[in-house]
Amino acid sequence: MTTVKFKYKGEEKQVDISKIKKVWRVGKMISFTYDEGGGKTGRGAVSEKDAPKELLQMLEKQKK
């Protein structure tokens, strides 16, 4: 499976693309929420140029 690597509050993280719930664009950044498990929702962002193509495809699907 594809993973998204990002920094959140100075901490390096990575999340499996299948856990991502919602994706949106903020300028040249792609922001997203994901399921952390235990009923928690995590947040992350990655630059458009560093985003995996699967994340960009999710963004396009949500626009429709």
Swiss-Prot record:
Its main location: cytoplasm. One of its GO terms (cellular component) is cytoplasm. One of its GO terms (molecular function) is RNA endonuclease activity. It comes from the Archaea. Hyperthermostable. Highly stable from pH 0 to pH 12. Keywords: Cytoplasm, DNA-binding. Gene3D superfamilies: 2.40.50.40. It is found in: Cytoplasm. Monomer. Belongs to the 7 kDa DNA-binding/endoribonuclease P2 family. NCBIfam families: Sul7d. Can constrain negative DNA supercoils. May be involved in maintaining the integrity of the genome at high temperature. This is DNA-binding protein 7a. It comes from Saccharolobus islandicus (strain L.D.8.5 / Lassen #2) (Sulfolobus islandicus).
